């Protein structure tokens, strides 16, 4: 007993004994209740000790609660007692049991909401989360190609506008640093932006390292290391480590951190790309409030301000800068209104019809008592309309200006709006409404409704002569009719009055007659038999009987007999104007605008033949009946031409509208889908169905405000009558917005179904749907029917004609089988003569087939299409093209199938060479089961070789794989590692390619010949030259050898360049297996040194053939006209009567300078005023400068303070090199040892000479040492290690190392010690070589960049200061002050201002300049003004 009583002690026991058992009752809780409770707990096998803490009580409550519904009275009492005890422990004051239970329920509801939110957040679409596999390990699911593709497209379309940030945030949900880097990689081309992003990432990483110093000593076993900044950025951490950090306990969310850093960087980029200030965002007089809010928040996101400031901006500026109409409403809402309330309240305000609505409202309130119905069948007064929202009379909810009432206007519950309400109301009569306000939904004639056969409504309309909706609108009779609207969710049963009796009857549009049961009618009757679904029944026929239906009267024949249900047939329904309506689905319209400053199209209709006019009239009448188009009057000034064509293989006509002009004027749309889905990316599914959406575009409504621009006119023959004019209510065929809006609507419609059935895969492309699942066929088909019903609810039909249930499925031009796919059968036409159009179609078919048929070639066929030819021109097939076509026919004879993708297996890509610059490839996961195949045949340059082409093919395949599967395959290439390495070392600027292995599939890729770097001893030397006369096109080519041989041939129709090549060809043809050739043509040398093995030029191909036959070839260059023996002789040989000799001063000086400094051609051309071609030839003739071609130049956009540092080795010594990235300026020094001490000393020297903000190094021990860190800290330099998303992050300094070594090689013999040679080389590089941006030398460029940076910074300060001012000014004769205008510049005597978009110069005496925040005018005569302006 004692133990049990000790549950509460002291103060708590006092509180316990003050609580009443019932509200207002006398009895209170006592100690005995606790003793009883602990005994009861034992009965329920619960520990009585739990009563001693609030946590224990909560556990007990959790156990008892599920049993409360079915439990005994004792159980409920126990639950109540413990609830009270729980609050006593919590020290929360409760008066009685009821209050404790209410509090408990409230607390539990809050908890539930939180968990729901949390699960909702968990349920957010995570594109590539870390998931748990069957073994319970956390594994990574890589980015989906759609995500990557969407991200690339966002950047392409939006550049770096503010929307990019939320898009990035959404797409990178749950991503690891590696995923984020992949995303950044795909947009790495935007180098300026990436540089800014890199800077931010490095700043944040350094800050992280500063706040989280590395822990001393080794890491205990079983524990993972703490991430460094570079680990978070994914540079120095592996994917496995990232997963461990993200899923550890406690977790380190490296992905989220890195994402935050990137978003910080993106903010800076957006700021740079979209520099609009939030103060400039004002709502236009007619701009919808929603659009204004969108612009406001788009700009707010880009503002660099704290969250508090942004909050203040939202609270004050949003209202302050709204237009007067909206401002009135927003101020009435008061300061605490949420954004949603604001948007709801301002709905419709600001639109063009707003003023009219306000007027109509005022008029209807003033006059509605006096309005009587004008129609013959309506007796009595018109009903007063009442608003669903505010309950006031005189307007409807659509026009209500009060804040929108929360919850549904139909059922009163919160969480949805009336249009989404699932409560199906059968009682729709105005007498007994389901709404408290007592007003059914009013259907305005202006709601021109388009038709789809999905959801039908009955409208009971008054009057014998129903007027057309458009007509009603024009004649201004909008307020005269008010119809009940009956939805068909349930049977349309209504109460009718017949013969003084009330009966319930079914409105049946399918019945011809009205049939009632058990009703006594006056007058005579005659017997009749009527047929129904259940057979024939005998009835009595009464004529001229009055029936009252929904307040409308009709007189007609009524049949009385034993009918299962009373039926009102069409004989009565037509009299009361009842119509069937097929409203277009409740799909939201997407607002569409014209391009700014443009008006709609006004293109005249061209004349049409009588049969076309007749066909169009019929089609339009049909479309109007279905509500797809509406008639319009002459007040619409727009027009688009319309015409008709016969449908393929049919006598039926088809209406075509030429929307080209409207398309030019319509805003641009974001292409929702970036490409078509590919079957190789489909995962294998047990059950598959393919559906097609019928009349796809016509099921989606067009924005009401845009419809007027789609106007067109059907003319009459011989202008007998004025043309009939129509406009579209739905998405028109041929209009540029239709595909994007349809795709967007379709996605929104499918989203709920996808969310409900996550295991069902739906690929949607326009109106084609592929649905796959792993369900049994029966269950799968049930799901398909669910999907079809779901689509039908929205008005989208899926016709049975195109509903494919059994394989093979025809989808998107493919044929899908359960375990394989292929392209739909391809028939190549047989023709005697081919036109350009025929060949284009043929090439298209073959390209389509090449996705799965390996070995398809189209190069020769494409050659036939070269040159500008008309589509109908006849093209004779060349022998090669005929052969190619025959080969393709053979390949297509045997059907080939592709496999489906299995995410658990690796992708492998294999490439084969087909010859003539064509390549074929297969991507597979298991041998002989290709996922897809393809071909590559691009010649990026006129002369190329196989290795170059192979790298290009690999890159094309990598990109294709990322798009389809989201990852790159492993490559199997027909090239030996040695050949690749030779190419790689020779051409150090060759591109990176992914992981690959050698596969021996002939023909192997090889470098067919190699040029010697030194002259061949003992081989004959040929001096070659060619010349041509520009006017006559005649020329000569020839050679002279060191052994006295010579030859010259005459050429016609040639050029200098061709003649030079011809001379080389002669020399190769007439020489032995080893030869030295000396040319004076830089052009010829350039081509041959790139070692091409194929060319578009026949002559180069002949030279290649000769080169391959030779054992050794040495090719050298000498400058022309320099008195070089053999060269001079051959020059005379070929110049006779051909070449005009050109003598230039300055060549000698340039050559001398070059021998000393080996400066590049740009420096010589500029310093000695010689033509570029001569300067290039001097460089090329120098054997020391002829080691390699010039580097291919990329574009690195870099800020002025960045330097890259690296150590390189030469002659066993260490050279420390520093490059100023923006200019290429070099500092280098031989250091005694690769230590931190030496590096730090070098760094301080560098910082003492130049403004160094950031250094970029690799992870060498000397750079990562504490000494260097200390030096960086002292000098205020930020240190970076590699760019996270760029494998060649040290590219600039790496290429400079090579450049430096090259220069040292050229001047090494001029210096005894290496350290002297290094400094000489640095001098040459910095001051004797010109080129790049501005044609400066690196030294000049550095100084220019730094000076410009200082000027820009100062100017920026001035501009920022100046932009804070506003100017009020007076024009020449107008005494009124205008303004405020923006101050652009302030000079001594005048200011430059911008008013609206006009820029003006105003004298100082006529301008008053004020700061933006003040209302005080500050002119020249005001002290405050003068202080402000400075």
From Swiss-Prot:
Record-given protein name: Gag-Pol polyprotein
Segments of this protein annotated with the region Interaction with Gp41? 7-31
Positions of region (Dimerization/Multimerization of capsid protein p24): 273-359
Q: Where is this motif: Nuclear localization signal?
A: 26-32
Motif: Nuclear export signal; annotated at: 16-22
Task: Identify the residues that the record assigns to the Reverse transcriptase domain, covering every copy.
Answer: 626-816
The family database entries (InterPro entries) matched by this protein are listed as: Aspartic_peptidase_AS, DNA/RNA_pol_sf, Gag_p24_C, Integrase-like_N, Integrase_C_dom_sf_retrovir, Integrase_C_retrovir, Integrase_cat-core, Integrase_Zn-bd_dom_N
DNA-binding annotation, residue ranges on this chain: 1365-1412
User: Domain Integrase catalytic: where?
Assistant: 1196-1346
* Binding-site residues for Mg(2+) 3, renumbered to this chain: 1206, 1258, 1294
Q: What else is known?
A: HIV-1 lineages are divided in three main groups, M (for Major), O (for Outlier), and N (for New, or Non-M, Non-O). The vast majority of strains found worldwide belong to the group M. Group O seems to be endemic to and largely confined to Cameroon and neighboring countries in West Central Africa, where these viruses represent a small minority of HIV-1 strains. The group N is represented by a limited number of isolates from Cameroonian persons. The group M is further subdivided in 9 clades or subtypes (A to D, F to H, J and K).
Query: Which residue ranges does the record annotate as region Interaction with host AP3D1?
Result: 12-19
- Which of UniProt's keywords are assigned here? Activation of host caspases by virus, AIDS, Aspartyl protease, Capsid protein, DNA integration, DNA recombination, DNA-binding, DNA-directed DNA polymerase, Endonuclease, Eukaryotic host gene expression shutoff by virus, Eukaryotic host translation shutoff by virus, Host cell membrane, Host cytoplasm, Host endosome, Host gene expression shutoff by virus, Host membrane, Host nucleus, Host-virus interaction, Hydrolase, Lipid-binding, Lipoprotein, Magnesium, Membrane, Metal-binding, Modulation of host cell apoptosis by virus, Multifunctional enzyme, Myristate, Nuclease, Nucleotidyltransferase, Phosphoprotein, Protease, Repeat, RNA-binding, RNA-directed DNA polymerase, Transferase, Viral genome integration, Viral nucleoprotein, Viral penetration into host nucleus, Viral release from host cell, Virion, Virion maturation, Virus entry into host cell, Zinc, Zinc-finger
Give residue ranges for domain RNase H type-1.
1016-1139
Q: Record's PANTHER family?
A: ENDOGENOUS RETROVIRUS GROUP K MEMBER POL PROTEIN, RNA-DIRECTED DNA POLYMERASE-RELATED
Q: What does this protein do?
A: Integrase catalyzes viral DNA integration into the host chromosome, by performing a series of DNA cutting and joining reactions. This enzyme activity takes place after virion entry into a cell and reverse transcription of the RNA genome in dsDNA. The first step in the integration process is 3' processing. This step requires a complex comprising the viral genome, matrix protein, Vpr and integrase. This complex is called the pre-integration complex (PIC). The integrase protein removes 2 nucleotides from each 3' end of the viral DNA, leaving recessed CA OH's at the 3' ends.
Name the source organism.
Human immunodeficiency virus type 1 group M subtype F1 (isolate 93BR020)
What EC number(s) has UniProt assigned to this enzyme? 3.4.23.16, 2.7.7.49, 2.7.7.7, 3.1.26.13
**Motif Tryptophan repeat motif in this chain: where?**
980-996
């Amino acid at each position: 007993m004692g133990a049990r009583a000790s549950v509460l002690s002291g103060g708590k026991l006092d509180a316990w004994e003050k609580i009443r058992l019932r509200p207002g009752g006398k009895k209170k809780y006592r100690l005995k209740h606790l003793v009883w409770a602990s005994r009861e707990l034992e009965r329920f096998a619960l520990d009585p000790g739990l009563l001693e803490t609030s946590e224990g009580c909560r556990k007990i409550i959790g156990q008892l609660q599920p049993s409360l519904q079915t439990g005994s009275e004792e159980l409920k009492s126990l639950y109540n007692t413990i609830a009270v005890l729980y609050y006593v422990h919590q020290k929360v004051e409760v008066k009685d049991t009821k209050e404790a239970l209410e509090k408990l329920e409230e607390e539990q509801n809050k908890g539930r909401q939180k968990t729901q939110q949390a699960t909702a957040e968990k349920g957010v679409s995570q594109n590539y989360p870390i998931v748990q596999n069957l073994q319970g390990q956390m594994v990574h699911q890589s980015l989906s190609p759609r995500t990557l593709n969407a991200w690339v497209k966002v950047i392409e379309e939006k550049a770096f506008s503010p929307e990019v940030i939320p898009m990035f945030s959404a797409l990178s949900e749950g991503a690891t640093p590696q995923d984020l880097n992949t995303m950044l990689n795909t947009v790495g081309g935007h180098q300026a932006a990436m540089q800014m992003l890199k800077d931010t990432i490095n700043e944040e990483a350094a800050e992280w390292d500063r706040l989280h110093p590395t822990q001393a000593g080794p890491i205990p076993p079983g524990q993972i290391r703490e991430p460094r900044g570079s680990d978070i950025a994914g540079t120095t951490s592996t994917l496995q480590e990232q997963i461990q950090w993200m899923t550890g306990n406690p977790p380190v969310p490296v992905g989220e951190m890195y994402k935050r850093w990137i978003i910080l960087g993106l903010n800076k980029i957006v700021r740079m790309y979209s520099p609009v200030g939030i103060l400039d965002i004002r709502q236009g007089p007619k701009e919808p409030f929603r659009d204004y809010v969108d612009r406001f928040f788009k700009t707010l996101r880009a503002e660099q301000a704290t969250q508090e400031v942004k909050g203040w901006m939202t609270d004050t500026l949003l209202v302050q800068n709204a237009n007067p109409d909206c401002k009135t409403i927003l101020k009435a809402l008061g300061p605490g209104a949420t954004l949603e309330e604001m948007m709801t309240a301002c709905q419709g305000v600001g639109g063009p019809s707003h003023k009219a609505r306000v007027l109509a409202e005022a008029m209807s309130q003033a006059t509605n008592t006096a309005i009587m119905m004008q129609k013959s069948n309506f007796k009595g007064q018109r009903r007063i309309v009442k608003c669903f929202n505010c309950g006031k009379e005189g307007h409807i909810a659509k026009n209500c200006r009060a804040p929108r009432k929360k919850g549904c206007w139909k059922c009163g519950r919160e969480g949805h709006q009336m249009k989404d309400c699932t409560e199906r109301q059968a009682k729709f009569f105005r007498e007994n409404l389901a709404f408290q306000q007592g007003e059914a939904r009013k259907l305005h004639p202006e709601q021109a409704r388009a038709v789809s056969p999905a959801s039908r409504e009955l409208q009971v309309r008054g009057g014998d002569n129903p007027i057309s909706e458009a007509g009603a609108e024009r004649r201004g009779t909008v307020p005269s009719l008010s119809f009940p609207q009956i939805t068909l969710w349930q049977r349309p049963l209504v109460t009718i009055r017949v013969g003084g009796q009330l009966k319930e009857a079914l409105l049946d549009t399918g019945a011809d007659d009205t049939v009632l049961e058990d009703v006594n009618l006056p007058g005579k009757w005659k017997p009749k038999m009527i047929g129904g679904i259940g057979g024939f029944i005998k009835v009595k026929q009464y004529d001229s009987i009055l029936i009252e239906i929904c307040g409308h009267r009709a007189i007609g024949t009524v049949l009385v007999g034993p009918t299962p249900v009373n039926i009102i047939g069409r004989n009565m329904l037509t009299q009361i104007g009842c119509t069937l309506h097929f409203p277009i689905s409740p799909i939201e319209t997407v607002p569409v605008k014209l391009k700014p400053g443009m008006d709609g199209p006004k293109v005249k209709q061209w004349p049409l033949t009588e049969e076309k006019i007749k066909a169009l009239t019929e089609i339009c009448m049909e479309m109007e009946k279905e509500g797809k188009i509406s008639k319009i009057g002459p007040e619409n000034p727009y027009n688009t031409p319309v015409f008709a064509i016969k449908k393929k293989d049919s006598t039926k006509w088809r209406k075509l509208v030429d929307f080209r002009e409207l398309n030019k004027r319509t805003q641009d749309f974001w292409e929702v889908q970036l490409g078509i889905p590919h079957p190789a990316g489909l995962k294998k599914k047990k059950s598959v169905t393919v559906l097609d959406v019928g009349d796809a575009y016509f099921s989606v409504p067009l924005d009401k405000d845009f419809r007027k621009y789609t106007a067109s006119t059907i003319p009459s023959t011989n202008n007998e009558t004025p043309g009939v004019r129509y406009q579209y209510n739905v998405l028109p065929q041929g209009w540029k917005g239709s595909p994007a809006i349809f795709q967007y609507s379709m996605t929104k419609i499918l989203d709920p179904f996808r969310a409900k059935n996550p295991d069902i895969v739906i690929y949607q492309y326009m109106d084609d749907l592929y649905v796959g699942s792993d369900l049994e066929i029966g269950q799968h088909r049930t799901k398909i029917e669910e999907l079809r019903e779901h689509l039908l609810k929205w008005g989208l039909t899926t016709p049975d004609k195109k509903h494919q249930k059994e394989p093979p499925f025809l989808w998107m031009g493919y044929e899908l089988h359960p375990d394989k796919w292929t392209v739909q059968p391809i028939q190549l036409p047989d023709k005697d003569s081919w036109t350009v159009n025929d060949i284009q179609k043929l090439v298209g078919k073959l390209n389509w087939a090449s996705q799965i048929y390996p070995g398809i070639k189209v190069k020769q066929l494409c050659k036939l299409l070269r040159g500008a030819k008309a589509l109908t021109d006849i093209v004779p097939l060349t022998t090669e093209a005929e052969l190619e076509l025959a080969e393709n026919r053979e390949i297509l004879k045997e059907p080939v199938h592709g496999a489906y993708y299995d995410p658990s297996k690796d992708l492998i890509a294999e490439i084969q060479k087909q010859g003539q610059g064509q390549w074929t490839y297969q991507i597979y996961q298991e041998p002989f089961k290709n996922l897809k195949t393809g071909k590559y045949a691009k010649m990026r340059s006129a002369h190329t070789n196989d290795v170059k082409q192979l790298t290009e093919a690999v890159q094309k395949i990598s990109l294709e794989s990322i798009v389809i599967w989201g990852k790159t395959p492993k490559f199997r290439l027909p090239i030996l590692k040695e050949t690749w390495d030779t190419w790689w070392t020779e051409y150090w600027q060759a591109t990176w390619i992914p992981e690959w292995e050698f596969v021996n599939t002939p023909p192997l890729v090889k470098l067919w010949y190699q040029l010697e770097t030194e002259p061949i001893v003992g081989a004959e030397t040929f001096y070659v030259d060619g010349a041509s006369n520009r006017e006559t096109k005649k020329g000569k080519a020839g050679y002279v050898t060191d052994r006295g041989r010579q030859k010259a041939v005459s050429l016609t129709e040639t050029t200098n360049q061709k003649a030079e090549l011809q001379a080389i060809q002669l020399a190769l043809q007439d020489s032995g297996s080893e030869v030295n050739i000396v040319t004076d043509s830089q052009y010829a040398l350039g081509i041959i040194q790139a070692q091409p093995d194929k060319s578009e030029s026949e002559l180069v191909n002949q030279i290649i053939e000769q080169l391959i036959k030779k054992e050794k070839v040495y090719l050298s260059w000498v400058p022309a006209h320099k008195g070089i023996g053999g060269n001079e002789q051959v020059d005379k040989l070929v110049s006779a009567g051909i070449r005009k000799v050109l003598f230039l001063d300055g060549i000698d000086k340039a050559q001398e300078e070059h021998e000393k400094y080996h400066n590049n051609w740009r420096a010589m051309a500029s310093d000695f005023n010689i033509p570029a071609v001569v300067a290039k030839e001097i460089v090329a003739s120098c054997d020391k400068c002829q080691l390699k071609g010039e580097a291919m130049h990329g574009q690195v956009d870099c800020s002025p303070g960045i330097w890259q540092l690296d150590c390189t080795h030469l002659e066993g010594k260490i050279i420390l090199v520093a490059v100023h990235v923006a200019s290429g300026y070099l500092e280098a020094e031989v250091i005694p040892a690769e230590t931190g001490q030496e590096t730090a000393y070098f760094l301080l020297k560098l910082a003492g000479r130049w403004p160094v903000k950031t250094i970029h190094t690799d992870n060498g021990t000397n750079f990562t040492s504490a000494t260097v860190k200390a030096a960086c800290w002292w000098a205020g330099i930020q240190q970076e290690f590699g760019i996270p998303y760029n494998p060649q992050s040290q590219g600039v300094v790496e290429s400079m190392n090579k450049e430096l070594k090259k220069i040292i090689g050229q001047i090494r013999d001029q210096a005894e010690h290496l350290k002297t040679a290094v400094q000489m080389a640095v001098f040459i590089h910095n001051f004797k070589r010109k080129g790049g941006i501005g044609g400066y030398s690196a030294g000049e460029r550095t100084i220019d960049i730094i000076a410009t940076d200082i000027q820009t910074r100062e100017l920026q300060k001035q501009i920022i200061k100046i932009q804070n001012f506003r100017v009020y000014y007076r024009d020449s004769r107008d005494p009124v002050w205008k303004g405020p205008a923006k101050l652009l510049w302030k000079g001594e005597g005048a200011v430059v201002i911008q008013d609206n978009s006009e820029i003006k110069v105003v004298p100082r005496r006529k301008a008053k300049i004020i700061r933006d925040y003040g209302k005080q005018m500050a002119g020249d005569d005001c002290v405050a003004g003068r202080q402000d302006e400075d």
